[in-house]
């Protein structure tokens, strides 16, 4: 077992309070942004507005972040993963999706430049489209997972929840003191970013969210299964899923619903 350590915390957080809660400035407007590649500050992202978009209806805003050596199209097209990490199919038109493109095929986030990029995308999208500002989410695999963690650290007040797939401390953690709903999903035999590193990331929010310390459950190697640990006593939910596998953008295989279902359900319950 890997111990999920409850680090000392200075504040006892109360009941969960949603971030923001206002509708974005784009609500009620006819959009000018279109599906496909858009630009902001010299960088690119792919935008997916749902079919039948209603500008009077607030939508979830979900960022899908690519892995090292990948790009935004890998997330959109579902290269070695389900498209949009399987979340677009589950959203059924309730969400606007964004796949940003990293610099040099990654998310080094030097001096916070990638967090600033996400900030700029959010502002551009929300000025034009109708977003529920209490319903922003981020997910990603590997370096995309590390970047999702960096957003949880630096933008806990702006995002409702993140789902970190096989992530590590590779995009920094500016801040990292505030609570946010956090889901970690990690292979027990990950040779690239080992499991204990994923547990360490989760422990940041075990502490921030005032959770009780809990042992992380693990499946037997070779079982093809997974074990979920839900922490208790948290102001914002924290869960961790250890699965029998390695460094995988699609845990238990592209056809598996493990990560898409867990992520979507976690986001909607956060």
UniProtKB/Swiss-Prot annotation:
Optimum temperature is 37 degrees Celsius. Residues 1-21 form the signal peptide. Its EC number is 3.1.1.73. Keywords: Carbohydrate metabolism, Hydrolase, Polysaccharide degradation, Secreted, Serine esterase, Signal, Xylan degradation. One of its GO terms (molecular function) is feruloyl esterase activity. Induction: Induced during growth on suberin. It comes from the Eukaryota. It catalyses: feruloyl-polysaccharide + H2O = ferulate + polysaccharide. GO terms for biological process: xylan catabolic process. Involved in degradation of plant cell walls. Hydrolyzes the feruloyl-arabinose ester bond in arabinoxylans, and the feruloyl-galactose ester bond in pectin. Active against paranitrophenyl-acetate, methyl ferulate and wheat arabinoxylan. Belongs to the faeC family. This is Feruloyl esterase C.
